[in-house]
Amino acid sequence: MSSPMRCLLSDPARYFQSFRLFLANSTEHQCMREFMEGQLPAVVESIGNGKSTINILSVGGGAGEIDLLILSKVQARYPRVTINNDVIEPSADQIFKYKERVAETSNLENVKFTWHEETAYEYESRMNAEKKSKKWDFIHMIQMLYYVKDVPATIRYFHSLLEPQAKLLIILVSGFSGWETLWKKYGSSFPLNDLCSYVSAADIKRILDSASLKYQLHELPSHMDITSCFIEGDKDGELLLDFLTETCEFSKTAPPELKRQVMEELKKPECSEKRDGKVLFNNNLNVIVIEP
């Protein structure tokens, strides 16, 4: 009898190990950087008009790689304006890395950082308890809506905190990605707990449409090299498989039939393409920019 499957998030150390490997093996941050360089300036064009201070809220800011790029674009548009950058991030380890990154980055003199070591839900609950509803000029939620209990309520809450000329930016996997194919088919077989759920930009679109909110959608092509997943016993392959299935030690704990089906699925054109002897998983993302 094999040991039962466990959600990857129940082992934070392994989760972050697999997440870092995912970033190293994918164009995830590269395609986000291209968006921030090319299209973000237009998004933040008028968020600070007439303001002496710009308030930015990063929900799930992680280790700050993308946050600092966003800040540089806001600074370029509004030089010398004071920026308050608040970060909601439940992982102390990620906050530590974020602070290190800030310390190593120049030109942040006019940015005041405040870190809140809590989840989005804990932040909302605390603000409600303190009867506070601070408004923001820019809120971003990058690759974090998988980790909230109630997606529509979370979007509603943070949308309600937007200033009249503000924007809410969400990045999630596309509804046209390997993730969508894999998770729509096998998600119910993976051991998700209440820490994590599968949601894609297609789901967010439905939520926004039903709330009659105005938004723009950008498609970001991205891929992840999963060739090592098909090498029996390969440590990196096993970690990437854990990340794909959100399952701790998937290779060792999944029922053989489920493992066989998932490995087959990952090779199919709906999930991946073969290029130069590599298997490249479709990691396409969507950026959704929501108006107040």
Regions found by a protein language model. Name each.
Residues 98-100, 127-129, 180-184, 229-231:
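Short aromatic-enriched loop/helix-cap "lid" or pocket-rim segments at secondary-structure transitions
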Residues 134-152:
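A short SAM/SAH-binding and catalytic strip from SAM-dependent methyltransferases
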Residues 152-167:
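A short glycine-rich, Lys/Arg-flanked "PGG" loop and its adjoining helix->strand segment in the class I
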Residues 1-51:
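Class I SAM-dependent methyltransferase Rossmann-like catalytic core
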Residues 166-196:
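Conserved class I S-adenosyl-L-methionine
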Residues 50-51, 129-135:
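Glycine-rich phosphate-binding loop signature in dinucleotide/nucleotide-binding domains
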Residues 54-126:
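Class I SAM-dependent methyltransferase SAM/SAH-binding core
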Residues 133, 199, 209, 214-292:
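Conserved Class I S-adenosyl-L-methionine
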